[in-house]
Amino acid sequence: MSEALNIPEEELRIGVYVCHCGSNIAGVIPPKEVAEFAATLPGVVHATDTLYACADSGQSLIKEDIKKYKLNRVVVSACSVRMHEPTFRGAVAEAGLNPFLMEMANIREQCTWAHCHDPEGALKKAKDLTAAAVAKVSFLQPLDMIRVPVSKRALVIGGGV
């Protein structure tokens, strides 16, 4: 039998940051409209758009807002998770928030690049991905990185010819 969902007991205070990524995102969809949509989602207390979220100024904005709005979750709707997730986890951690209480929505590659000839569809998808990230971050719990000792011994059975 599965355990019940562990929903945070503290009030959710989610901040959403929608990046323009220069014209990579803003050239196809209006990030401000995505931010305005995000502001209507449950638990979101602050939503804004920013020119380059990954730049020092964008990271500073996130760090300041975590303190200013007492945010306990952050969503960044921007570009590649693979490239920028460590950047935003670091910024969130520097602001005193557990870095695992941050989620990203890749609206550049998955929306504006993939649907550049369908701005209306790209905008709808960007809103959907942002809403999904907000829903996911609502259920995230703080995690800690741990180190596990590695044994330098191994036994290989059936290693082949």
Q: For the regions a protein language model found, what residue spans apply to each?
A:
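Residues forming the flavin
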Residues: 1-161
